[in-house]
Amino acid sequence: MNTQILILTLVAAIHTNADKICLGHHAVSNGTKVNTLTERGVEVVNATETVERRTIPRICTKGKKAIDLGQCGLLGIITGPPQCDQFLEFTADLIIERREGNDVCYPGKFVNEEALRQILRESGGINKETTGFTYSGIRTNGVTSACRRSGSSFYAEMKWLLSNTDNAAFPQMTKSYKNTRNEPALIVWGIHHSGSATEQTKLYGSGNKLITVGSSNYQQSFVPSPGARPQVNGQSGRIDFHWLILNPNDTVTFSFNGAFVAPDRVSFFKGKSMGIQSEVPVDTNCEGECYHNGGTITSNLPFQNVNSRAVGKCPRYVKQKSLLLATGMKNVPEIPKKREKRGLFGAIAGFIENGWEGLVDGWYGFRHQNAQGEGTAADYKSTQSAIDQITGKLNRLIEKTNQQFELIDNEFTEVEKQIGNVINWTRDSITEVWSYNADLLVAMENQHTIDLTDSEMNKLYERVRRQLRENAEEDCTGCFEIFHKCDDDCMASIRNNTYDHSTYREEAMQNRVKIDPVKLSSGYKDVILWFSLGASCFLLLAIAMGLVFMCVKNGNMRCTICI
């Protein structure tokens, strides 16, 4: 019997660690959560607050011509009660009103006062010109104990016209003023309502009193209403102040027969200014452009949550206390367990798995290993490209939201309360709209930032893949296994986009042939082992059956079947 010995040899190819280059992005252990159009609470590496919540509790006036009215009410600068004597003419770009300020001395009110306040706040200061009115047959020196200087006096810019003697008839008079300047003029006059009919007769004589005022675009008649009223400043009478803006070359005419408080000077405005009502102190050592009743907002942010009635060059008021603007890429913190399990390249390519917390000098970068060791380097080109597109996002938001705000008070007269309610409702509605708009604007910018940074990562990955071509193989974790020896200079050429794949092509192709093209991962090893075992058993069984068949054929073995 011929004996044949068959030897089955199992050859295992062991692949040593190849040179590798991996791509990844910067990550931090604790990022900042922002909202995007599609998702809330997305963690990013960097974010900037866009809502200002801080304020300086002072009115900063450095570099400004500021005027603090103190006890003088804003409207008093036109009529001239004693407390406003030093403010009858001035120049300012910031007018500060105080709660203690009073517009009048003899009790009364300004008609349509809110509109007049707004005009004066924007005036930039005032200079004045005499009306040139002259009178005969009457007294022009009416005074009252309610307006005291060294003794009884009156409004500095007005003339209280009285009968020549008590109870004497007041003559019918007509006075006109023509505005000869090339700018509008503000004219104020008063209607005196006596405390009683007896007092009116004493001051202006008997009979009905009528005052008529007219210009090219204004016509109004006034009838005084004498009567008992509660005393204010020792007076039961009242003066209603009326006003009009007289255009250049226009003329206003006053016709009256008593109870008339005549203008002595008219007012002209100087440039532009801003007014603020506040009780906080003035600080000449700090600068500001945005003011509210609690102080100054000094911020370059596009939004603020300090005061809805801030005035000046202010951030938009929104209800949100925080709106974070992403200024960095999406953060996927490095996972320590993966790093321990897979070594240097365990936490590779953040756009696939997670980021690199050690990559601090760039947003994107490379890690490599070769015979000379391991290394990490930032990719400045892709980093700068992303930064260039993100830089200026805050400024663009500011450009979209910046607006000069003006103060509109809630101190409306009875006649103006409905207008005041409309203004307040409108202000609240605008706040609601801008709060929504701010949320949407920031979410859109955040979405764009995250998409942009992902795009730059993909561009870098594609750049490397196109360079290496068949000289390397992707491993689906952001790494490329290189099939040739790649020293530090070679790695640098890949990073710098100067790699020449043809130089290494022959070596790479030879090495690819030696390497089993099927890369076994732990998930497939058991399947291959069972397949190998089954194939070996089948081969042994086939050999045994072949030997039996040969023996039977040669007569060396007989098979008897019994039935």
From Swiss-Prot:
Signal peptide: 1-18
Extracellular side, ranges: 19-526
Bilayer-spanning residue ranges: 527-547
Glycosylation sites: N30, N46, N249, N424, N496
Post-translational modifications: Palmitoylated.
Keyword terms, alphabetized: Clathrin- and caveolin-independent endocytosis of virus by host, Clathrin-mediated endocytosis of virus by host, Disulfide bond, Fusion of virus membrane with host endosomal membrane, Fusion of virus membrane with host membrane, Glycoprotein, Hemagglutinin, Host cell membrane, Host membrane, Host-virus interaction, Lipoprotein, Membrane, Palmitate, Signal, Transmembrane, Transmembrane helix, Viral attachment to host cell, Viral envelope protein, Viral penetration into host cytoplasm, Virion, Virus endocytosis by host, Virus entry into host cell
Domain of life: Viruses
Compartmental location: Virion membrane; Host apical cell membrane
GO molecular function terms listed in the Swiss-Prot or TrEMBL record: host cell surface receptor binding
One GO biological process term: fusion of virus membrane with host plasma membrane
Pfam annotation, one family: Hemagglutinin
UniProt membrane topology term: Single-pass type I membrane protein
Origin species: Influenza A virus (strain A/Starling/Victoria/5156/1985 H7N7)
Lineage, uppermost ranks: Viruses, Riboviria, Orthornavirae, Negarnaviricota, Polyploviricotina
Lipid sites, type S-palmitoyl cysteine: C559, C562
Residues flagged as site, Cleavage: R342, G343
GO cellular component, as recorded: host cell plasma membrane; membrane; viral envelope; virion membrane
HAMAP family: INFV_HEMA
Subunit (UniProt): Homotrimer of disulfide-linked HA1-HA2.
Name the UniProt record assigns to this protein: Hemagglutinin
Matching SUPFAM superfamilies: Influenza hemagglutinin (stalk), Viral protein domain
Misc remark: The extent of infection into host organism is determined by HA. Influenza viruses bud from the apical surface of polarized epithelial cells (e.g. bronchial epithelial cells) into lumen of lungs and are therefore usually pneumotropic. The reason is that HA is cleaved by tryptase clara which is restricted to lungs. However, HAs of H5 and H7 pantropic avian viruses subtypes can be cleaved by furin and subtilisin-type enzymes, allowing the virus to grow in other organs than lungs.
Disulphide bonds in the chain: C22-C479, C60-C286, C72-C84, C105-C147, C290-C314, C486-C490
Family statement drawn from the similarity comment of this UniProt entry: Belongs to the influenza viruses hemagglutinin family.
InterPro entries membership: Capsid_hemagglutn (IPR008980), Hemagglutn_HA1_a/b_dom_sf (IPR013828), Hemagglutn_influenz_A (IPR000149), Hemagglutn_influenz_A/B (IPR001364)
Residues in compartment: Cytoplasmic: 548-563
